[in-house]
């Protein structure tokens, strides 16, 4: 049986982090969450997964490039079977994460919220 690995990424300034928590809480038991170590969406995803006892793959922040992409961004998607990206509609970094997920043909859903929708 193939493990389900969900890459979760997004903007540091994403305005409604409850979206991230609710998504993680909806995942089936045993799902592996892959996320970076940045503030915002990454932190919310790791926190929610840890609170549920889901395994977490953490992609450390490194300044290396892999195939023209930041190594950290590529690492978030390594082994992912699907991705959920939470975007404020402005972050160029998150826009790049969307492109990486598409490049690796990972089924991806992008959730966009206007920064004016703050919690």
Task: Identify the meaning behind each predicted range.
Residues 2-6, 10-119:
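Acidic/glycine-enriched connector segments
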